Amino acid sequence: MVLSRLDFPSDFIFGSGTSASQVEGAALEDGKTSTAFEGFLTRMSGNDLSKGVEGYYKYKEDVQLMVQTGLDAYRFSISWSRLIPGGKGPVNPKGLQYYNNFIDELIKNGIQPHVTLLHFDIPDTLMTAYNGLKGQEFVEDFTAFADVCFKEFGDRVLYWTTVNEANNFASLTLDEGNFMPSTEPYIRGHNIILAHASAVKLYREKYKKTQNGFIGLNLYASWYFPETDDEQDSIAAQRAIDFTIGWIMQPLIYGEYPETLKKQVGERLPTFTKEESTFVKNSFDFIGVNCYVGTAVKDDPDSCNSKNKTIITDMSAKLSPKGELGGAYMKGLLEYFKRDYGNPPIYIQENGYWTPRELGVNDASRIEYHTASLASMHDAMKNGANVKGYFQWSFLDLLEVFKYSYGLYHVDLEDPTRERRPKASANWYAEFLKGCATSNGNAKVETPL
């Protein structure tokens, strides 16, 4: 298939993105406090987070690179611990100034800001006070944080995402990235859903009329398919969908968890009161989707009997991530949202391909990956999927959980200047966004997941 930007609707948004903890650096400067996610990134990447890639100081340079690339929009997150260092209470003037300056710089240069409120980085003060997501206080504190953001930035920011990868955030630990045990992921997920709905209610009641913005939630969403033609693998694939996507989406659409979760998890799964069910239903204007790979699923009926229960043992399935995305995977995922959830507006908020850092700027495999992804997404859109935008991940090489890079622009973390250099993929994306055609078959790439 040969595609250009001209094959997409005129109002379709093309962008790229990063997150605060992975791009800003200045980890404990100008009043900012620590977060568990930043400690996790430091351990897993082996890099010094305090300097990072220096987005905090190089934001004007980075915005000019966005202009050169031709981005419509840029997705980034606001560091809760930079804006409100105590997690609650006084706003940090220097943090407020930084985000105001950054947003103004984007808009001055014709780049639309898309803001994520929470990208895994809960302030350590709140983790210490009530173990973060496990405490019901999280709902109140997150809503107060969102209120500050809406008040201070909402006159210029029209697109808000409450929580990044709500399902992964609920289920994964920040020690070695393992799955949370027993009841923990379900309690965390429950509180995330309630906190999200609370922030949406606040925005709609207090700010929507004057700011006219849109607000949604983000999910990590692989497309799960049976590993074999065996009927049990097909049933297991649907369970995997229910345990990852349906876990969050069904409450937002129907006010209830999927029947699969109720059956498999039993009393360990929290329940919504009648009032909460009404509260969370329809609490979004769009859904953000982070999609990287397809995942083959094999039935594993014995795993649910494990004494060491996790979300994976509960779903009674073995998952095998696959890197081929040029075929049906993104298409299948988007058509699932269309079929099962009433075709909500979707933004692909992360779609990226890892390469070893030492590869430098020669990343032809990334071009192949993104070309295939765009073709798969375009196929879904031709079939009626309501996709509104596509954000490549990531704009720059960042601090990542694995020692790989996803960026359009190379950043050498050993170079004290943190120089940005365009990769082949940056030049490709810029040409695509100018309307030049790109074509690709069914790309096959490897994945570290």
From Swiss-Prot:
Soapwort saponins possess anticancer properties and are also being explored as enhancers for endosomal escape in targeted tumor therapies. They may also serve as precursors for vaccine adjuvants. Component of the oleanane-type triterpene saponins (e.g. saponarioside A and saponarioside B) biosynthetic pathway, leading to the production of natural products with detergent properties used as traditional sources of soap. Pathway: Secondary metabolite biosynthesis; terpenoid biosynthesis. Keywords: Cytoplasm, Glycosyltransferase, Transferase. A beta-D-glucoside binds at residues 22, 119, 164-165, 292, 350, 393, 406. Its EC number is 2.4.1.-. One of its GO terms (molecular function) is hydrolase activity, acting on glycosyl bonds. It is found in: Cytoplasm. The gene is GH1. GO terms for cellular component: cytoplasm. The active site is at residues 165, 350. InterPro entries: Glyco_hydro_1 (IPR001360), Glycoside_hydrolase_SF (IPR017853). Mainly expressed in flowers, flower buds and young leaves, and, to a lesser extent, in old leaves, stems and roots. This is Glycosyl hydrolase-like protein 1.
